[in-house]
Amino acid sequence: SSKTEIEIKDFIKELGINLPFICENGSAIYNLDLINKKLPKKVILSKNIKSISRLYREKVPLRIRKKIIDLRKINDVEQIKIFGLPKNKIKLALKRSFTIPIKFNDDIKDKKKFIKIIKDTGLKIQEGGRIMNLGDNVDKSLAMQIFLKNVKTFIKDPIKTIGIGDNHNDIGMLKNTDIPCLVYSESFKGKNIKIKNLIVSDKPSPQGWADVMKKAVLKI
């Protein structure tokens, strides 16, 4: 998930169960030990947020940084509008260990230049609908593969993976799952995505997530 560790922990607490999970776009894996006690409780794949912030300040020219809004530093009203979350959930979304949520406030030419600088620095920009996330060179697909490698050490039965996404930062993951599912989104319709056997919903979230999940389960 692109969500933070604390967001996901809050969600699984509401569900009343404990689960392994991947957070912040593949930055870390938690609770592998629930599958087998010999597996680690935590696997960190990303640089920490302090290191990423330092590289950002050192490598990105001030002229471009002035066009970038750090969404952790704007007022509550703007945060609620941009994230589309209630105030109590915003606090959880901003408690980040590995990524910085940002918005780019200028022309496409400078945005492309910024993304190139970040890539050359060894970091990565992942776009997820309302916001961009600045983080290390990791993603959901890489974390998923590491997760499966660990799990397959102890589970010898065949494993089928279901990937569900609704945005740019989900494409790599969907390409590497057995049953890929794309939820309809106004901001990302994914018309040109070429993924074999892709299940696509007709409706947006939350109904779209339920629809593709039902179809995916029937394919297992």
Regions found by a protein language model. Give the residues of each.
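Active-site phosphate-binding/coordination module
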Residues: 2-72
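Short, well-ordered alpha-helical microsegments
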Residues: 5-9, 111, 141, 170-171
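Hydrophobic/aromatic ligand-binding patch that stacks against planar heteroaromatic rings
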Residues: 11, 79, 172-173
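Short, structured coil segments at secondary-structure junctions
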Residues: 15-17, 25, 121, 176-178, ...
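Short hydrophobic/aromatic-enriched beta-strand-loop microsegments
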Residues: 18-24, 88-90, 180-185
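Conserved beta-strand segments of alpha/beta enzyme cores
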Residues: 20, 67, 124, 197-199
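Conserved acidic, metal-coordinating active-site core of Asp-based
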Residues: 63-162
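Mg2+-dependent phosphoryl-transfer enzymes with acidic/Ser/Thr/Gly-rich catalytic loops
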Residues: 131-220
